[in-house]
A protein has these predicted regions:
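Iron-sulfur cluster-binding electron-transfer modules in prokaryotic oxidoreductases
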Residues: 1-217
Length: 217
């Protein structure tokens, strides 16, 4: 493929849902774009940051920035990710929270759905089969923070036959590793309760659940 991107797969794709990464590659290939992995990838560091291990997170961030700089600066290809949390960390939390310099790289790191939308808007084509399905979509907090929700929604609306309902923007309550901790369970459930209720209501009317949410979103 003449056009290439580097894929920051993150921990969720690597350990929990590798099919998501495989599906993304199929979509990009169908658009005429090849996919490479970074020469070396570490966890984006958000779980470490959230639990106070900033020194360890900084070491991982430095490794990732070096690999991203190689992709962008040497190979001349952008970096995309399927996790909005990873994307937010690579672009904004590295310099602001960890004091890791990503100068010259930030604008070349994108969420996969935003990159896909831009390419379609520029004239690239993607063969999309009709998908007669009702879905509800929940936007993760970090995607909201970046202001990139619109790109994902517009991309979904391009799928023929897909009936999309967007839930009101609400935190799911998981907040990375916060909701996994026993002492935080009641608070986590209380935060997510309105969202859970809306999902149950839509499920009763035949809607399927669709989200960008990953473990650290």
């Amino acid at each position: 493929y003449k056009d290439q991107v580097a894929f920051f797969h993150g921990c969720f794709v690597n350990y929990n849902h590798p099919q998501l990464g495989k599906d993304l590659i199929k979509v990009l290939n169908a658009m005429g774009t090849g996919v490479q992995l970074l020469s070396k990838e570490k966890c984006c560091g958000v779980p470490l940051i959230a639990n106070g291990f900033t020194d360890k997170a900084r070491k991982q961030a430095i490794t990732n920035v070096e690999s991203i700089r190689e992709a962008v600066g040497v190979k001349g290809i952008p970096v995309i990710a399927t996790s909005s949390t990873c994307t937010f960390a690579l672009r904004d939390e590295y310099p602001e929270v960890l004091n890791v310099d990503n100068k010259g790289l930030r604008d070349h790191i994108e969420l996969a759905t935003r990159w896909l939308w831009r390419k379609l808007d520029e004239g690239k084509t993607l063969p999309l089969k009709p998908l007669p399905l009702k879905v509800v979509y929940h936007t993760p907090c970090h995607m909201e923070k970046m202001g990139w929700t619109l790109y994902t929604l517009e991309l979904l609306r391009k799928i023929p036959g897909l009936e999309l309902t967007v839930l009101d923007s609400q935190c799911c309550g998981i907040a990375g590793t916060y909701g996994f901790k026993k002492e935080n369970y009641p608070t986590s459930q209380a935060i997510g309760a309105p969202l859970f209720r809306h999902r149950r209501e839509r499920r009763g009317s035949g809607h399927h659940r669709l989200r960008n949410l990953q473990m650290a979103d």
